[in-house]
């Protein structure tokens, strides 16, 4: 039996002789045309250390596909370095790249009639972009994460990229010597791999393992370790078997599977970006999933892992403590996962976890459900007159996730950062960064530079920051993002004035502008939308087409 269900459309029959000629030029032989064509979406790039170690994984995938009886076909996907673009206009292209990557995967798989695809990525938007493309194409598919980075070292302390952002605030406040500042800058990132805490890249990779679209244990491996190369060869064989079984992404990515992924995001203390990305992933999978579903899962799922940014450990420590399977096994034992969900291995979640040992007593990275770090998840969905469609608050690491204070209003990140660095922001203030949403930014840039500076100055818990933009996975503190409707669309965040009283209350799930309805009506009557910041090119296209953050900021949600 042949398994070239799709590729035979361009390799079989007299009329396809010209097509086969192109394949012969690539070194194919006649008997290759009966084998499945397997795409390898290679995100290798020397733009960023997150992706600079991916070529060896693509090479391993090629070998594994050939050994399993498939024809590997490599094509490229782009990346943006969030860490390098952060705090600049370049950050506006980050979320755009998610859509570009999704389009690349869907286009190549569809245009070349591929029978299956492996997507290999590293930096933050590589994961959701690749998954969205896989789900749109809906051919047998598997995600390979490029691996986490190992920590840097300085004066006996582990370092990572967020260490540098927070050092900026400490140095500017006179709390750090210049020599220490420069050495942290030089030593924080020792080599290839994605940023090391439970930031966005590691959050998404871990969630894909829980979703069933990556192999067990693969999401927390280090890029520089040999085990990841061996894992990719195994993954290639698993994918070829999935092609034979015609096991497709939409057979795996169901509503219950997304609930599993979100439960693991909550248990590991993952990134706020996961909310936006899983809204987009569910849309690509044609699964009914709303921002309120995150809150439903949050309330029943404890935080079990002591991971940065608000905790102690890095992703590689989680790997050594048992990885995502250990977390999932603990959740499954207490009825917090759906064990009957299918995975890319051809086995259910419960079957994959059957031989995973219970939590080891010699580690404190992962806690038991009966002894959690927090009884409920950390990504709370707030609503109120400032965000009737919902917004996302990250409430781990805070003594009290409640405050009321005067608004300090900024319409770009740079002026907000300048105010922090000039010591113009004081405890009790609520910073409002607006016109930074999907349409207004455009591209919903991340606000790690301001939040990192606040933490470095010791203001992380005493200053609130709300925005219609996003936050890096490395952010923690009194922060609320994804405010929807956004300012550019006329959301009430556009009506906030300097000095207005704002309440952030994660206990009551409330984000409220303490201004009367009559006053808001007067302000709205005087408000007009600003002119678009871009009228040509990819940012203009994104701004014109992007849905609300509460719907994932996707570009193909037509008619609403």
UniProtKB/Swiss-Prot annotation:
Organism phylogeny: Bacteria, Pseudomonadati, Pseudomonadota, Betaproteobacteria, Burkholderiales
PROSITE patterns registered for this protein in UniProt: ILVD_EDD_1, ILVD_EDD_2
Name of the protein in question: Dihydroxy-acid dehydratase
Gene3D superfamilies: IlvD/EDD C-terminal domain-like (3.50.30.80)
Organism: Leptothrix cholodnii (strain ATCC 51168 / LMG 8142 / SP-6) (Leptothrix discophora (strain SP-6))
Family per record: Belongs to the IlvD/Edd family.
Complexes and interactors: Homodimer.
Signal peptide start-end: none
Pathway given in the UniProt record: Amino-acid biosynthesis; L-isoleucine biosynthesis; L-isoleucine from 2-oxobutanoate: step 3/4; Amino-acid biosynthesis; L-valine biosynthesis; L-valine from pyruvate: step 3/4
An example Gene Ontology molecular-function term: 2 iron, 2 sulfur cluster binding
Known cofactor(s): [2Fe-2S] cluster; Mg(2+)
Positions bearing N6-carboxylysine: 125
Encoding gene per record: ilvD
Enzyme class: lyase
Catalytic activity, EC: 4.2.1.9
Reaction(s) the record says it catalyses: (2R)-2,3-dihydroxy-3-methylbutanoate = 3-methyl-2-oxobutanoate + H2O; (2R,3R)-2,3-dihydroxy-3-methylpentanoate = (S)-3-methyl-2-oxopentanoate + H2O
Note describing how the cofactor binds: Binds 1 [2Fe-2S] cluster per subunit. This cluster acts as a Lewis acid cofactor.
Annotated keywords: 2Fe-2S, Amino-acid biosynthesis, Branched-chain amino acid biosynthesis, Iron, Iron-sulfur, Lyase, Magnesium, Metal-binding
Matching PANTHER family: DIHYDROXY-ACID DEHYDRATASE DAD, DIHYDROXY-ACID DEHYDRATASE, MITOCHONDRIAL
């Amino acid at each position: 039996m042949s398994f070239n269900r799709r590729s035979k459309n361009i390799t079989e029959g007299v009329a396809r002789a010209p097509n086969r000629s192109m394949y012969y030029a690539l070194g194919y032989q006649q008997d290759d045309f009966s084998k499945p064509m397997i795409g390898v979406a290679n995100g290798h790039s020397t733009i960023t250390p997150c992706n600079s170690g991916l070529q060896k994984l693509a090479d391993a995938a090629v070998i594994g596909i050939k050994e399993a009886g498939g024809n590997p076909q490599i094509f490229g996907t782009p990346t943006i370095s969030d860490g390098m673009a952060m705090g600049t206009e370049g950050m506006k292209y980050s979320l755009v790249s998610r859509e570009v990557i999704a389009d690349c995967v869907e286009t190549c798989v569809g245009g070349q009639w591929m029978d299956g695809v492996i997507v290999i990525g590293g930096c933050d938007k590589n994961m959701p972009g690749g998954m969205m493309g896989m789900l749109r194409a809906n051919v047998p598919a598997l995600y390979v994460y490029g691996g986490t980075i190992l920590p840097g070292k300085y004066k006996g302390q582990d370092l990572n990229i967020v260490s540098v952002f927070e050092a900026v605030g400490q140095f500017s406040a006179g709390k750090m010597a210049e020599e220490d500042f420069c050495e942290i800058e030089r030593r924080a990132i020792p080599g290839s791999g994605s940023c090391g805490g439970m930031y966005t890249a590691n959050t998404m990779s871990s969630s894909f393992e829980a979703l069933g679209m990556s192999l067990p244990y693969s999401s927390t491996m280090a890029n520089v370790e040999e085990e990841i190369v061996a894992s990719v060869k195994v993954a290639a064989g698993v994918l070829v078997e999935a092609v034979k079984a015609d096991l497709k992404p939409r057979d795996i990515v169901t509503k219950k599977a997304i609930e599993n992924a979100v439960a693991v995001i909550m248990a590991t203390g993952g990134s706020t970006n996961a909310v936006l990305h899983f809204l987009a992933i569910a849309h690509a999978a044609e699964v009914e999933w709303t921002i309120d579903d995150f809150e439903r899962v949050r309330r029943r799922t404890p935080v079990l892992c002591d991971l940065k940014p608000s905790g102690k450990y890095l992703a590689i420590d989680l790997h050594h403590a048992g990885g995502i399977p250990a977390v999932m096994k603990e959740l499954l034992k207490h009825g917090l996962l759906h064990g009957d969900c299918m995975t890319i291995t051809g086995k259910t979640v419960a079957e994959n976890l059957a031989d995973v040992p219970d939590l080891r007593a010699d580690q404190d990275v992962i806690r038991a459900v009966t002894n959690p770090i927090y009884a409920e998840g950390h990504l709370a969905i707030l609503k109120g007159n400032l965000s009737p469609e919902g917004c996302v608050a990250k409430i781990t690491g805070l003594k009290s996730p409640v405050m009321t204070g005067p608004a300090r209003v900024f319409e770009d990140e740079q002026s907000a950062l300048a105010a922090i660095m000039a010591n113009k922001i004081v405890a009790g203030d609520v910073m409002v960064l607006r016109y930074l949403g999907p349409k207004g930014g455009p591209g919903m840039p991340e606000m790690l530079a301001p939040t990192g500076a606040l933490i470095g100055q010791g203001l992380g818990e005493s200053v609130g920051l709300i925005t219609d933009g996003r936050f890096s996975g490395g952010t923690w503190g009194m922060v609320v993002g994804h405010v929807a409707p956004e300012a550019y669309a006329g959301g009430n965040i556009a009506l906030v004035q300097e000095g207005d009283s704002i309440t952030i209350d994660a206990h009551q799930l409330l984000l409220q502008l303490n201004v009367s309805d009559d006053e808001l009506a007067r302000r709205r009557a005087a408000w007009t939308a600003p002119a678009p910041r871009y009228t040509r090119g990819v940012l203009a296209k994104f701004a014109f087409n992007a849905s609300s953050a509460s719907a994932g900021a996707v570009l193909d949600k037509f008619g609403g």
